[in-house]
C-alpha cells in the first residue's frame, strides 16, 4: 500500500506497520535545500540548557525521535520545556542541582548519544535512575562509558554483556580523573565531562585522535571555563551554567546524503544552506574532494558557536581513492553514504581502520557490503573496512536492519539503479531525518514510501 506523507509524520520502530521504500531513477537534483538541525548539537543544547540557571532559547532544534527522547527524559526529570514552533525550544533551566527523580525508567529510544551523555549527567545526581532503549540501542556497548564513570566513583550496572539497560545509583561523591580514552569517541569524552561538572578537582580527558568538540564549544557558550588543547580537555568541577540562546546549524551527517547524491547523479546542481562544518565532522567532505567532487563553500560564518557555510554541489565524475585512516573518526557516521559514492566511482575505493562501524545502530560495515553485493557491486570485506569496486548498480531488495543511515544511503543507490531498489524497514529514518522522503522527492529523487501491516 502506498503511504501518504501524513501517515509517516512520526513513524516508530515499535509500530506494527512495516514501512519500505522503492527507489528508482528520478531527475537530476536541483534546488536550494534546508537540511534539519544537527542531531548531536540538539541533544547537547537541550541538556545543557536544562542544567543552566535561567531560560534558554534554542532555534534550529532537530524535531526527530532521538532528540524528542532526550527532551522527554529531561521533562521527566523536572525540566519545563516549551515548544513554540516545530524547530524551537524554550528551556527553563533548573541549575546543576535542580533535577528531580523519575519514578519510571527513562526511555532513550534509539538515541545512543542521549543515553551516553545522560549517563554522565545522572551518575552525579542524589537519586537513582534507569536508562533503557529500543531493541537496537539495547545491543550497543556501554562499558566504554560506564568504565571511566566508575573510575570517577559512580555506581552503574549494565547487562552481563555491557549493554543497556543502565541502572545508575545516585548519591555518589565523584572525583576528577585523568582519563585516557581507548577509542576516539566524542560520546565518551562528553559523558566524562558532564560527570566532571559535579566532581571534586579537575577532570582530564585525553584522546587517541581529536573528536568532535560540540560539548566543549557548547559548555563555553553556557559560561563554563574549559581548557582545550590538541587531544586533551580539562574541566574544573563545581562550575555553574548560565542560560544562553543557541542557533543550531544544519546537520552535516544528514547533508552527507545530498552531497553524495548530487555528486553521482548526472546533471545535478544543488545548494545546501547553513550546514555545520565542525572540523572534526567533515572527513567525508575531504574524501569526496579527493575523489574529484565539485563542492564549493560560500557564506561561511559562525552559528551557535559552530562554523557554518552554504555548500553548492554539482555532478562530477568521481574516482576511487584510499580513505586516509586519520579521517575515519571524522566521518564515522558518513560511511554508508561514502560506500555508495565509491560504488558509483571509477576504480577502487579502499576503507580501513573503520571497525567502529560494526557497533553502530547496526553492523554498518556488514550491512553496506551485503547490500552493495545484492545490487551487483563487487566489494571485498575486511575486519575493519572494505574495498569497493566501482561499476554499474543493479536492482534488488535491501535489508536496512532498521538503521536510518543504511536506508538513506541505499535510496541514493536506487537513483543509479538499472531498475528499482526496494529498501526494507525504513521507519527508523525518523530518528534523525523525519522529512527525508519529502525533501528528497522535492530535489528530484525517485522515491516512494509504502506500508504493509506487519
From Swiss-Prot:
- List, alphabetically, the InterPro entries matched: Enolpyruvate_Tfrase_dom, Enolpyruvate_Tfrase_sf, EPSP_synthase, EPSP_synthase_CS, RNA3'P_cycl/enolpyr_Trfase_a/b
Q: Which UniProt keywords apply?
A: Amino-acid biosynthesis, Aromatic amino acid biosynthesis, Cytoplasm, Transferase
Q: Where in the cell is it found?
A: Cytoplasm
Q: List the SUPFAM superfamilies.
A: EPT/RTPC-like
- The residues the record assigns to binding 3-phosphoshikimate are 39-40, 44, 185, 187, 333, 360
Keyword field contains Membrane: no
Predominant location category: cytoplasm
Task: Tell me the active site.
Answer: 333
Q: Tell me the residue numbers annotated for binding phosphoenolpyruvate.
A: 39, 112, 140, 187, 364, 405
Q: Which GO terms describe its cellular component?
A: cytoplasm
What GO biological process, any one, is recorded here?
Answer: chorismate biosynthetic process
Catalytically driven reaction(s):
3-phosphoshikimate + phosphoenolpyruvate = 5-O-(1-carboxyvinyl)-3-phosphoshikimate + phosphate
Which PROSITE patterns does the record cross-reference, listed alphabetically? EPSP_SYNTHASE_1, EPSP_SYNTHASE_2
Q: Which GO terms describe its molecular function?
A: 3-phosphoshikimate 1-carboxyvinyltransferase activity
Top-level division of the source organism's lineage: Bacteria
Give EC number(s), comma-separated.
2.5.1.19
Query: Which pathway is it part of?
Result: Metabolic intermediate biosynthesis; chorismate biosynthesis; chorismate from D-erythrose 4-phosphate and phosphoenolpyruvate: step 6/7
What exactly does this protein do? Catalyzes the transfer of the enolpyruvyl moiety of phosphoenolpyruvate (PEP) to the 5-hydroxyl of shikimate-3-phosphate (S3P) to produce enolpyruvyl shikimate-3-phosphate and inorganic phosphate.
Q: Which HAMAP family does the record match to this protein? A: EPSP_synth
**Family, per the entry?**
Belongs to the EPSP synthase family.
What does the subunit comment say?
Answer: Monomer.
Name of the molecule in the record: 3-phosphoshikimate 1-carboxyvinyltransferase
Say which species the protein is native to: Xylella fastidiosa (strain Temecula1 / ATCC 700964)
Amino acid at each position: 500500500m502506498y503511504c501518504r506523507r501524513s501517515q509517516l509524520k512520526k513513524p516508530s520502530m515499535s509500530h506494527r506497520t512495516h514501512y519500505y521504500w522503492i527507489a528508482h531513477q528520478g531527475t537530476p537534483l536541483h534546488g536550494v535545500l534546508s537540511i534539519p538541525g544537527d542531531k548531536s548539537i540538539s541533544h547537547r543544547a537541550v541538556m545543557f540548557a536544562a542544567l543552566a540557571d535561567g531560560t534558554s532559547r534554542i532555534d534550529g532544534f532537530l524535531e526527530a525521535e532521538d532528540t524528542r527522547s532526550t527532551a522527554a527524559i529531561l521533562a521527566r526529570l523536572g525540566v519545563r520545556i516549551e515548544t513554540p514552533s516545530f524547530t524551537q525550544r524554550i528551556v527553563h533551566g533548573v541549575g546543576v542541582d535542580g533535577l528531580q527523580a523519575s519514578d519510571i525508567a527513562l526511555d532513550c529510544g534509539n538515541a545512543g548519544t542521549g543515553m551516553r551523555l545522560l549517563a554522565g549527567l545522572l551518575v552525579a545526581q542524589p537519586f537513582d535512575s534507569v536508562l533503557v532503549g529500543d531493541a537496537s540501542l539495547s545491543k550497543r556497548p556501554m562499558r566504554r562509558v560506564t568504565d571511566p564513570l566508575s573510575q570517577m566513583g559512580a555506581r552503574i550496572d549494565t547487562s552481563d554483556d555491557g549493554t543497556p539497560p543502565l541502572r545508575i545509583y545516585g548519591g555518589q561523591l565523584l572525583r576528577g580523573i585523568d582519563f585516557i580514552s581507548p577509542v576516539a569517541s566524542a560520546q565518551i569524552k562528553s559523558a566524562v565531562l558532564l560527570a566532571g561538572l559535579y566532581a571534586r578537582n579537575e577532570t582530564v580527558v585525553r584522546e587517541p585522535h581529536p573528536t568532535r568538540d560540540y560539548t566543549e564549544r557548547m559548555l563555553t557558550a553556557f559560561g563554563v571555563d574549559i581548557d582545550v588543547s590538541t587531544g586533551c580537555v580539562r574541566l574544573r568541577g563545581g562550575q555553574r551554567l548560565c542560560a544562553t540562546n543557541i542557533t543550531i546549524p544544519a546537520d552535516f551527517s544528514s547533508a552527507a546524503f545530498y552531497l553524495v547524491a548530487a555528486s553521482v547523479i548526472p546533471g545535478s546542481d544543488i545548494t545546501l544552506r547553513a550546514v555545520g562544518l565542525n572540523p572534526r565532522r567533515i572527513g567525508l567532505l575531504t574524501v569526496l574532494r579527493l575523489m574529484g567532487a565539485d563542492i564549493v563553500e560560500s557564506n561561511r560564518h559562525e552559528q551557535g558557536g559552530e562554523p557554518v557555510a552554504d555548500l553548492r554541489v554539482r555532478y562530477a565524475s568521481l574516482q576511487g581513492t584510499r580513505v586516509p585512516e586519520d579521517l575515519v573518526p571524522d566521518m564515522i557516521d558518513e560511511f554508508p553514504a561514502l560506500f555508495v559514492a565509491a560504488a558509483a566511482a571509477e576504480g577502487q575505493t579502499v576503507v580501513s581502520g573503520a571497525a567502529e562501524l560494526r557497533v553502530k545502530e547496526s553492523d554498518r560495515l556488514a550491512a553496506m557490503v551485503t547490500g552493495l553485493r545484492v545490487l551487483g557491486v563487487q566489494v571485498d570485506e575486511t575486519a575493519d573496512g572494505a574495498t569497493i569496486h566501482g561499476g554499474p548498480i543493479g536492482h534488488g531488495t535491501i535489508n536496512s536492519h532498521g538503521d536510518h543511515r543504511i536506508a538513506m544511503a541505499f535510496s541514493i543507490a536506487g537513483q543509479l539503479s538499472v531498475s528499482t531498489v526496494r529498501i526494507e524497514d525504513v521507519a527508523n529514518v525518523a530518528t534523525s531525518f523525519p522529512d527525508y522522503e519529502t525533501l528528497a522527492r522535492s530535489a528530484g529523487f525517485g522515491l516512494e514510501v509504502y506500508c504493509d501491516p506487519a
